[in-house]
A protein has these predicted regions:
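A short beta-strand micro-motif
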Residues: 3-8
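Basic helix-extension-helix modules of the SAP/HeH family
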Residues: 17-95
Length: 95
């Protein structure tokens, strides 16, 4: 079980403990896993494509962002602007 946040009315809000089974989750490189329609779609693109999208949609990003980190930044902004599906979970550590 992991703590999970979801986009609710443009805000990322804690929704409880959930299992990630059967869903595609992307490691954002910040200790969290992310999921949602845009996350899945964007994480399949090249870094160059993501940089172009980030610039066009005026998403703040850093030159050293990973491909998945950049995909997450774009998806998170889309969720806030357009109410798109977006989930965030604490990353589980291996025992």
């Amino acid at each position: 079980m992991m703590r999970t946040w979801a986009n609710i009315n443009g805000k990322l809000e804690f929704i409880g403990l959930c299992s990630a089974r059967g869903e595609e989750w992307v490691d954002g490189g910040d200790g969290y896993m992310y999921s949602g329609n845009d996350v899945a779609e964007l994480s399949c693109m090249s870094y160059h494509e993501l940089r172009s999208i980030a610039e066009a949609e005026e998403v703040d990003f850093f030159p050293d962002d990973s491909l998945y980190g950049l995909a997450v930044r774009i998806a998170e902004q889309r969720a806030a602007k357009y109410g798109r599906q977006f989930f965030k979970q604490e990353k589980r550590s291996a025992v």
